[in-house]
């Protein structure tokens, strides 16, 4: 299930006693082919937040929300950093940023939007639900 996958992905980055992550996951099953690239994307986002973003300071946090739009048949992932130092557009794109922007989304014919707001990084990914949802046989 997605909630457990997200909790497992962020666990190595959590500091005991601090509420660094708020997760609002959709209870869906992600297929194994989609789970690894999603976790790799989250790993890169966490690494960047620890090095440059909200998780560099004690009061910083990351909100992770997902939702399914049944009508459009899409899965939406949103990462929002808050309470960290002001951020700006990076002067160059690292391999990690390339992975975030192109890895998960492009593998499943989706799209990624990265915004470097003064209040923190926001990453939104949309992919077709059918490409990532595990199908349970009846």
What are the functions of these language-model segments?
Residues 127-138:
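C-terminal end segment of the histidine kinase catalytic
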Residues 22, 63-65, 113-115, 124:
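Short beta-strand patches within cytosolic ATPase/nucleotide-binding catalytic cores
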Residues 59-72, 80-81:
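Short beta-strand/loop element within the Bergerat-fold HATPase_c
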Residues 87-113:
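ATP phosphate-binding glycine-rich loop and adjacent ATP-lid/helix-beta elements
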Residues 14-60, 91:
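Conserved short strand/loop->alpha-helix "switch" segment adjacent to the catalytic nucleotide/phosphoryl-transfer site
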Residues 1-12, 65-67:
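Short beta-to-alpha transition helix within the HATPase_c
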Residues 85, 117-124:
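Glycine-rich nucleotide-binding loop
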Residues 19, 73-77, 121:
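Short beta-strand element(s) in the Bergerat
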């Amino acid at each position: 299930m997605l909630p457990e996958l997200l909790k497992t992905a962020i666990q190595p980055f959590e500091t005991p006693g601090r509420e660094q992550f708020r997760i609002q996951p959709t209870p869906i099953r992600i297929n194994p082919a989609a789970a690894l690239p999603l976790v790799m994307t989250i790993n890169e986002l966490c690494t960047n937040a620890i090095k440059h973003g909200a998780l560099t300071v004690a009061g910083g946090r990351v909100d992770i929300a997902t939702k399914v739009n049944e009508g459009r048949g899409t899965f939406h992932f949103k990462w929002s950093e808050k309470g960290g130092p002001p951020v700006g557009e990076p002067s160059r794109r690292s391999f990690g940023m390339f992975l975030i922007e192109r890895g998960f989304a492009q593998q499943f014919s989706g799209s990624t939007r990265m915004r470097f707001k003064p209040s923190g990084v926001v990453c939104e990914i949309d992919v077709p639900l059918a490409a990532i949802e595990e199908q349970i046989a009846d």
